[in-house]
């Protein structure tokens, strides 16, 4: 009796900063195909069956949370061709800028992920020239600089 073919797809997990090396080692040891973009290494793309992806996160092999497709309210599945193109782009062009599709709007708490202010946390304010990062000492003083969206990530991610 023939068995149904397994549906393998790309699933996306958001992890904490600095976890990518451990996750890469675990997934390699388990023989699971995956991709972690170097310039946005809180995203882990898993190429596996949905049930196995769920088990990896539930068992703590990959610590994080899945990205959900808000239209279908199911785990986001990245189409094969789209993932191949993305991997090719960021592999062949290491300076390609990976930017979050999460809107960074006035009031968003962010962390600087590259450049001389890497590691600094602050709040985004809008200005005519783009966005500014503000670091405040409440009720006393605040300092701000113009910064590019690609240099910051929302803190909740």
Each model region followed by its residue ranges:
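Short loop/turn segments at connectors of secondary-structure elements within structured domains
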Residues: 118, 129-131
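Short coil-to-beta-strand transition motifs
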Residues: 104, 113-120
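Acidic-enriched and Gly/Ser
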Residues: 1-109, 124-127, 134-157
């Amino acid at each position: 009796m023939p068995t149904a073919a397994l549906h393998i797809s790309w699933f996306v997990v958001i992890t904490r900063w600095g976890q990518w090396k451990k996750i890469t080692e675990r997934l390699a040891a388990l023989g699971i195909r995956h991709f972690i973009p170097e310039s946005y290494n809180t995203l882990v793309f898993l190429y596996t069956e949905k049930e196995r992806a769920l088990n990896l996160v539930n068992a703590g092999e990959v610590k994080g949370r899945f990205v959900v497709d808000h239209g279908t309210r199911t785990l986001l599945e990245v189409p094969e061709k789209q993932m191949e193109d993305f991997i090719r782009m960021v592999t062949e062009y290491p300076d390609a800028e990976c930017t979050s599709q999460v809107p960074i709007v006035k009031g968003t708490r962010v962390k600087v992920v590259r450049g001389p202010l890497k590691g600094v946390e602050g709040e985004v304010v809008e200005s005519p020239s783009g966005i500014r990062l503000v670091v405040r000492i409440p009720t006393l003083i605040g300092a701000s600089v113009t910064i590019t969206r690609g240099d910051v990530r929302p803190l909740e991610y």
